[in-house]
Amino acid sequence: MGSLGAILKHPDDFYPLLKLKIAARHAEKQIPSEPHWAFCYSMLHKVSRSFGLVIQQLGPQLRDAVCIFYLVLRALDTVEDDTSISTEVKVPIVMAFHCHIYDNDWHFSCGTKEYKVLMDEFHHVSNAFLDLGSSYKEAIEDITMRMGAGMAKFICKEVETIDDYDEYCHYVAGLVGLGLSKLFHASGAEDLATDSLSNSMGLFLQKTNIIRDYLEDINEIPKSRMFWPRQIWSKYVDKLEDLKYEENSAKAVQCLNDMVTDALVHAEDCLKYMSDLRGPAIFRFCAIPQIMAIGTLALCFNNTQVFRGVVKMRRGLTAKVIDQTKTMSDVYGAFFDFSCLLKSKVDNNDPNATKTLSRLEAIQKTCKESGTLSKRKSYIIESESGHNSALIAIIFIILAILYAYLSSNLLLNKQ
């Protein structure tokens, strides 16, 4: 759960945080008994706790397919990311990865921590993959093949231009969007979305992660590959690592704002994609990460902290997004609120201010035209109730009641 200080400052976070904690515990207890499926779901919770929780929104068959799709691509990504593997070894592996998923004897030791376990025990993922229906397997194989080919191309190529950046993000994330759309369609729950909209869903998330993770990636040892395009950063500094130095703060923020503005171009497509979804479970599965993405961009924009430390939404706000995202009106409301926050941070002297404002106004126009903004729950316009001692007292009363309830249940279970 969030820290006590954060809860006291934002007491309305408490209930969503509590619900999130209970849901996470429940999700971890839903691990199947069959060995290969037990491995896959327990590994899913280890490599992505948030995804492991969001995936529980889906029905059983689709949930299994998405779980395996995620783990297969996570394994492929582990090979791509391992800088200790030579290009001569790495390229053939990623190119043939779509074949390896059919071979339950195949494994390749690489990565660290839980990712090494995933790779060493990959036969569990292969066995689970082989259990899936043929339409699910075909979709996963196709996307894995295309992603592997794209990764192989960029193992030997730097991201120089914005077109390169879009192409790389297509291979590693846009294809995930295409694959998920295929899985949703295969389940019979959704019409097949267009490739361009599916691609934008992936690019919006991937570009947000690339922006947010600048400092972690630039400081990684051994040195990680970087994906900020030279066409953008070279306008501001001579070397990409120069952005992290305090004397370059003004230029660094301008570069950051340029990157955020580039990411915002995908937001309208994302809204269109989500508005076309019919099933509430699939809708929540798709919508929650997209709201988190625009919220993260709003925090990163014009913020030197991106080059100094970690910038992310507080856990309580994340819990609120997960708890409150139920309908498209919630999505329009969140995108509108976060675009308002972004707009308030635009410096008119920024070289990209006009372009940034234009993109934000386009997002706001789409949200307004939905006609649902009056129903929205605000994520970012908060009252000063965080300092209200009565509310703080209520929190501790609730905690005491909860503790007593859980303790009594524990005693009853022991009898």
UniProtKB/Swiss-Prot annotation:
Entry-linked PROSITE patterns: SQUALEN_PHYTOEN_SYN_1, SQUALEN_PHYTOEN_SYN_2
Biological-process GO terms, alphabetical: farnesyl diphosphate metabolic process; isoprenoid biosynthetic process; response to jasmonic acid; response to molecule of fungal origin
Keywords: Endoplasmic reticulum, Isoprene biosynthesis, Magnesium, Membrane, Multifunctional enzyme, NADP, Transferase, Transmembrane, Transmembrane helix
Cofactor: Mg(2+); Mn(2+)
Pfam families in the record: SQS_PSY (PF00494)
GO molecular function: squalene synthase [NAD(P)H] activity
KW Transcription (keyword) present: no
Record-annotated membrane-spanning stretches: 281-301, 391-411
Subcellular location: Endoplasmic reticulum membrane
CDD domains referenced in this protein's UniProt entry, alphabetically: Trans_IPPS_HH
Coiled-coil residues: none
Membrane topology according to the record: Multi-pass membrane protein
Annotated Gene Ontology cellular component terms: endoplasmic reticulum membrane
Main localization of the protein described in the UniProt heading: endoplasmic reticulum
UniProt KW Nucleus keyword: no
Pathway listed: Terpene metabolism; lanosterol biosynthesis; lanosterol from farnesyl diphosphate: step 1/3
EC supergroup of this enzyme: transferase
Source superkingdom: Eukaryota
E.C. number(s) listed in UniProt: 2.5.1.21
Induction: Induced methyl jasmonate (MeJA) in adventitious roots. Induced by A.niger mycelium-derived elicitor, thus improving ginsenosides production in adventitious roots culture.
Catalysed reaction, written as an equation: 2 (2E,6E)-farnesyl diphosphate + NADH + H(+) = squalene + 2 diphosphate + NAD(+); 2 (2E,6E)-farnesyl diphosphate + NADPH + H(+) = squalene + 2 diphosphate + NADP(+)
Recorded family membership: Belongs to the phytoene/squalene synthase family.
Function: Component of the triterpene saponins (e.g. ginsenosides or panaxosides) and phytosterols biosynthetic pathways. Catalyzes the biosynthesis of squalene.
NCBIfam families xref list: squal_synth (TIGR01559)
Protein name: Squalene synthase 13
Gene assigned in the entry: SS13
